[in-house]
């Protein structure tokens, strides 16, 4: 998709708008004829009172070029009028997409517009092409040009996770009926008020795609083009990687105010935990036009009419490729957004007599070539990594000698794919020259070029130091100049820079404060036989090291492989920043406490620029606890997550998630990046997620959220307990093939068990040993909706689902679960103690909660007064005993 920001003068605007006669269609619905919204109907139809008026022409509008003789205008006007009369001038309203429902929207016709609401987290703005929204639109024939203009007033909105929004949107598909809670995909071009990101180059004074000041507007204003979606089946998810998304900012007040890189907001009338404001826009004038040039988007000052910004989608044909004879244009609201659209004007014109299209410009891509590996190493065998945003050839030289390194001449580089090169370092400073020449035929698409095809050289320096001791001691007061002995401790940052395979870094108890993030970069790797250990010093008081990011740092990120992290706390990362992100492979994360961070406590995820095989894999998160993590909107901060970009073999064992703003666990996947690797969660507990004590706000509040976007992902939940979460206990979240074994769900606010999908045609759920039980909300059913699968995989004698009619837990044989069989139904905490703790060996202790008494464990199939051992989670003190603590000996230097 090729677009370019274009600013028009007032004269040019007049020429574009008035060089041919246009007809204005204004929606006029009298107050006493406003139609009520009927959720049983497919659409809200508002029509029958539109008027057609010809725009008065002045002498300045006359065009005497050949083919535009004024004497010919009458016949041309008649043709245009006929085309516009063929347009469907009836305004319609429809609600569709993920998170929408019959109780979460409103469409209120006004005298010359409409009020649109999407409430209670209904709908969401997404980059996958499957927005969930309330949409008010007209169908317009594809063979005529048009313009649509209106004033949008933002009456109220509540921030959650930047999926709120409003739009003036052109789409190539709209469902015929309301499609509540089901994905519906469409190519589109929109003026969008939602999450918009941009990078500003202060020297060039323009938005760039290279380095600069990055601003994340939560919310901002821009255009968004989504293409690559097949029109054959809008309810079917597109193939991963097939969807293209491009955004361009239309409002850049953050850069005018010279704000620091970060997250901001530009809209007023907002509620919730808002980001700092760089503007307070509550009303804006917007226009969308289809001309012979393309789809043109304009943003005007609503008071003066001055054009503030504009954008053009030149490859508009991508929205006109469907078999339908019409395109859809209108206004939208999503997720906690209420807007009033007034002064709607729609005009039509004939492409044959409209001004010819402008020449399509070439979009230029700035080169971004980067060595992504560390500048420090404690390993003589060192991995250097390189990435470029173009195909080309790379040569690596020793700068001191000018010699090409072994097998390092003309290495083929693929755009946005990391390339690794192994080398041996010399003690001290090692200087390398990376020379990259982009392919002159890149990129392989029309109207796009690199700004330079010249060879670029990058000087990369690696400082190699072998630490004095194999076990180094670090303290909060440690020095970069320390040697790692008890008498002369190192700083933590210095110890991490020069860590090497087999080394142990021992952290003294105390608070380690950071104003910025703490990163273990790529290339600082252990091995399978000799991992690098970062562990807490054992002490009689059981005091722990605490990494405190002061509300400004980005948390801790682990990019490397074969590390062991153990026994310390991570807290207070900045808003929207995770506590710990694991982006490497084969790491063991054990006994880490992540709490009160600005986003998810502990998350496994990689980069969408990397292929699946480069995503983090084979990581074990064991006996960790994550609690009271909260993002500003209460929509992102989970206890644990393994989502979006993860490979195979990631496991959570013996972990506890409670009082996190969003979910306990989140295994979300989206269509842009496709399915993720299988994740196993076992011997774990999720409870009371969705709210944080002492902080206003509520999130999604699911215990174990096991999928997303109707994508396959056979994630498995084993021997785990979910209770008193704000919403669902065990949630497939549209994942099509999750597996649940020997797990318990108790007294959750919504469904205890939810196995469903929103857009896939088939499911393949497997469940065995589910115990769903309630003492509250007895009328709450389960949400189990298998599609075209063997239902015996879900319904059989080893699953006890909640029967809301009989108000009991029962299996397919009619056997029920008695309260008397359960050791404890009490979730009340003792003062100063959570209802879930740990045994001395690290295993989870639930204090009898939802544990079947030994005498009621069925050992013979004939008995009906008990449950088989495989039904429900069992926490007997031996579920996840801690691994052996690494041995260490801190060096004591002589006085």
Identify the meaning behind each predicted range.
Residues 341, 507, 534, 563-567, ...:
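All-beta strand scaffolds that present successive hydrophobic residues in beta-strands
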Residues 487, 525-578, 630:
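Right-handed parallel beta-helix/beta-spiral solenoid domain characteristic of secreted/periplasmic
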Residues 472-476, 493-514, 531-539:
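Glycine-rich repeat segments that build the extracellular carbohydrate-interaction surface of secreted
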Residues 159, 515-518, 544, 549-558, ...:
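Short glycine/acidic-rich loop motifs that flank beta-strands on beta-rich extracellular proteins
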Residues 475, 508, 521, 535-537, ...:
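Feature marks extracellular polysaccharide-active and adherence modules
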Residues 448-494, 511:
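Right-handed parallel beta-helix/beta-solenoid
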Residues 47, 52, 60-62, 67-362:
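Extracellular glycan-recognition regions
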Residues 360, 749, 759-895:
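Acidic, glycine- and Ser/Thr-rich low-complexity intrinsically disordered tracts
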């Amino acid at each position: 998709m090729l677009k370019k920001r274009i600013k028009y003068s007032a004269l040019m605007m007049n020429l574009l708008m008035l060089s041919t006669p246009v007809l204005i269609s204004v929606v006029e619905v009298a107050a006493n004829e406003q139609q009520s919204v009927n959720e049983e109907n497919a659409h809200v139809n508002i029509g029958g009172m539109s008027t057609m008026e010809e725009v008065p022409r002045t002498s300045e509008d006359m065009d005497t070029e050949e083919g535009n003789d004024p004497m010919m205008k009458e016949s041309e006007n008649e043709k245009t009028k006929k085309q516009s009369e063929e347009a469907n001038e009836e305004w319609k309203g429809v609600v569709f997409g993920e998170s929408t429902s019959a109780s979460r929207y409103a469409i209120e016709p006004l005298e010359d517009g409409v009020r649109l609401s999407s409430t209670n987290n209904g709908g969401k703005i997404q980059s996958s092409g499957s927005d969930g929204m309330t949409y008010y639109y007209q169908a317009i024939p594809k063979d005529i040009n048009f313009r649509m203009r209106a004033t949008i007033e933002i009456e109220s909105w509540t921030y959650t996770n930047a999926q709120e929004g409003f739009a003036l949107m052109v789409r190539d598909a709209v469902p015929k009926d309301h499609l509540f809670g089901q994905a519906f995909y469409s190519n589109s071009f929109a003026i969008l008020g939602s999450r918009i990101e941009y990078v500003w180059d202060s020297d060039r004074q323009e938005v760039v795609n290279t380095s600069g000041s990055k601003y994340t507007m939560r919310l901002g204003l821009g255009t968004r083009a989504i293409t690559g979606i097949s029109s054959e089946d809008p309810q079917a998810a597109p193939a991963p990687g097939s969807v293209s998304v491009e955004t361009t900012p239309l409002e850049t007040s953050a850069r005018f105010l010279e704000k620091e890189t970060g997250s901001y907001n530009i809209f007023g009338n907002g509620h919730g935990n808002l980001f700092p404001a760089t503007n307070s826009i509550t009303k804006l004038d917007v226009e969308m036009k289809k001309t012979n040039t393309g789809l043109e988007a304009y943003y005007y000052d609503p008071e003066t009419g001055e054009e503030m910004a504009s954008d053009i989608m030149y490859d508009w044909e991508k929205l006109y490729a469907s078999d339908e004879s019409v395109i859809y244009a209108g206004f939208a609201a999503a997720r906690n957004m209420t807007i009033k659209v007034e002064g709607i004007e729609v005009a039509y014109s004939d492409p044959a007599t409209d001004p010819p299209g402008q020449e399509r410009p070439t979009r230029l891509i700035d080169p971004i070539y980067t060595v992504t590996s560390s500048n420090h190493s404690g390993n003589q065998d060192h991995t250097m990594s390189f990435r470029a945003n173009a195909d080309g050839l790379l040569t690596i030289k020793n700068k001191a000698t000018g010699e090409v390194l072994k097998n390092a001449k003309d290495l083929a580089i693929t755009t946005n794919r990391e390339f690794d090169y192994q080398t041996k370092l010399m003690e001290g400073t090692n200087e390398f020259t990376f020379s990259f020449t982009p392919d002159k035929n890149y990129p392989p698409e029309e109207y796009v070029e690199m700004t330079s095809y010249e060879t670029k050289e990058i000087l990369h320096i690696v400082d190699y130091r072998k630490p004095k001791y194999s076990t180094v001691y670090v303290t909060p007061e440690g020095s970069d100049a320390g040697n790692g002995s008890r008498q002369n401790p190192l700083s933590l940052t210095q110890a991490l820079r020069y860590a090497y395979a087999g080394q142990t870094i021992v952290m003294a108890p105390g608070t380690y404060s950071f104003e910025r993030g703490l990163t273990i970069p790529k290339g600082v790797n252990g091995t399978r036989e000799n991992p690098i250990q970062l562990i807490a010093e054992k002490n009689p008081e059981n005091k722990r090291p605490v990494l405190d990011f002061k509300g400004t740092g980005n948390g801790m990120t682990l990019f490397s492989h074969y590390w062991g992290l153990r026994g310390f706390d991570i807290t207070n990362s900045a808003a929207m920043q995770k506590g710990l992100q694991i982006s490497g492979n084969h790491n063991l994360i054990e006994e880490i406490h992540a709490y009160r961070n600005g986003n998810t406590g502990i998350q496994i995820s990689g980069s969408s620029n990397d292929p699946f095989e480069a995503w983090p894999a084979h990581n074990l998160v064991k006996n960790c606890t994550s609690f009271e993590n909260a993002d500003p909107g209460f929509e992102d901060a989970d206890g644990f997550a393994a989502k979006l970009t993860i490979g195979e073999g990631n496991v959570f064992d013996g972990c506890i998630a409670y009082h996190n703003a969003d979910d306990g666990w989140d295994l979300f996947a989206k269509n842009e990046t496709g399915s993720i690797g299988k994740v196993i969660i076992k011997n774990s507990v999720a409870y009371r997620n969705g709210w944080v004590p002492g902080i206003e706000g509520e999130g999604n509040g699911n215990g174990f959220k096991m999928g997303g976007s109707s994508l396959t992902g056979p994630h498995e939940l084993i021997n785990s307990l979910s209770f008193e979460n704000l919403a669902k206990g065990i949630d497939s979240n549209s994942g099509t093939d999750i597996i649940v074994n020997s797990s318990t769900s108790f007294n959750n606010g919504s469904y205890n068990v939810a196995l469903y999908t929103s857009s896939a045609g088939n499911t393949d759920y497997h469940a065995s040993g589910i115990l769903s039980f309630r003492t509250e909300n007895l009328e709450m059913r389960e949400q189990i909706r298998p599609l075209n699968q063997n239902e015996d995989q879900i319904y059989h004698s080893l699953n006890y689902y909640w029967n809301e009619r009989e108000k009991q837990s029962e299996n397919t044989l009619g056997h029920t679960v008695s309260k008397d069989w359960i050791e404890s139904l009490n979730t009340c905490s003792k003062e100063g103690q959570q209802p879930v703790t740990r045994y001395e060996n690290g295993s989870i202790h639930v204090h009898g909660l939802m544990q079947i008494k030994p005498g009621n464990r069925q050992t013979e199939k004939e008995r009906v007064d008990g449950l088989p051992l495989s039904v429900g989670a069992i926490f007997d003190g031996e579920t996840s005993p801690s691994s052996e603590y690494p041995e260490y000996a801190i060096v004591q230097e002589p006085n």
